[in-house]
Amino acid sequence: MDRYPDLNPDAGELETAEVVVTDDVLVKAFALGPGAEMEPHDHPDATNVFHVTEGTVTVLQDDEEARVTAPGVVLHERGRAHGARNDGDETAVLTASLCPLPGGG
């Protein structure tokens, strides 16, 4: 029943895995090695929620950024640019929940 993936990125690398995929929701895991970044992007028709599960990430949202340490939750409203960066020395992990899926329910 546990779908949490085993991700182990090197420094500067970002590893991802789809954890849950249904007709109306996507949960994806992101493991950021030290120095890695998830480039800012947006989802015009979907809400995105980050759940920081391990370590500390710098969350980027439009022109703002904030350090979020596990356990932490960050809401990204529809159409709001968002991303994440690992400024630390250890791997950081977050999941991102996206719903509804673009073109989905």
Model-derived regions, located:
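Short histidine-centered beta-strand/loop micro-motifs
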Residues: 17-19, 29-30, 38-43, 61, ...
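Ligand-binding loop in jelly-roll beta-barrel domains
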Residues: 78-104
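Short, conserved beta-strand element in jelly-roll/cupin
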Residues: 31-33, 44-59, 97
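Short, charged/polar surface micro-motifs in flexible loops or helix N-caps
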Residues: 23-25, 34-36, 54-56, 65, ...
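Short, surface-exposed secondary-structure edge patches
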Residues: 29, 49, 64-66
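A generic "binding-loop/recognition-motif" signal
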Residues: 25, 34, 45, 64, ...
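A short, N-terminal "cap"/entry segment at the start of jelly-roll beta-barrel domains
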Residues: 1-28, 39, 74, 105
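Short acidic-glycine-tyrosine-enriched beta hairpin
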Residues: 63-79
